[in-house]
Amino acid sequence: MDLIKIAEEAFATGKQHPSFKAGDTITVAYRIVEGSKERVQLYRGVVIKIAGHGDKKRFTVRKMSGTVGVERIFPIESPAIDSITVNKVGKVRRAKLYYLRALTGKKARIQEKRVNQ
């Protein structure tokens, strides 16, 4: 049991990300290594689900690339994640938004929650 905790602490990045939930539109700056070059790719989409807990937490982001829906799963403690930015706070009543996969066009939009700042 202690070996698992030691391994988790060794791989923990310790980065602080903003809090977000399912339905929020976020931008993930993800570092990609291509050969000897490294670049940052921005991936913007709607958070469909958040799964796991602690260091093993991961979230799924769905975006539309043309007419095709693309989903990507990001571990929250991934060292390749440069930053996470919350663009919109969505107004949803579910924790898992799998129903968005079947919707297209304006039906797939999520209402924006008004946030006082």
From Swiss-Prot:
Name of the protein described by the UniProt record: Large ribosomal subunit protein bL19
Mind telling me which PANTHER family this protein's record contains?
Answer: LARGE RIBOSOMAL SUBUNIT PROTEIN BL19M, RIBOSOMAL PROTEIN L19
Question: Lineage of this protein's species?
Answer: Bacteria, Pseudomonadati, Bacteroidota, Bacteroidia, Bacteroidales
**GO MF, one annotated term:** structural constituent of ribosome
Q: Name one GO biological process term.
A: translation
Q: Which organism is it from?
A: Phocaeicola vulgatus (strain ATCC 8482 / DSM 1447 / JCM 5826 / CCUG 4940 / NBRC 14291 / NCTC 11154) (Bacteroides vulgatus)
Question: What protein family is recorded?
Answer: Belongs to the bacterial ribosomal protein bL19 family.
Record's function text: This protein is located at the 30S-50S ribosomal subunit interface and may play a role in the structure and function of the aminoacyl-tRNA binding site.
Alphabetical UniProt keywords? Ribonucleoprotein, Ribosomal protein
Annotated Gene Ontology cellular components are: cytosolic large ribosomal subunit
Q: Where is the signal peptide?
A: none
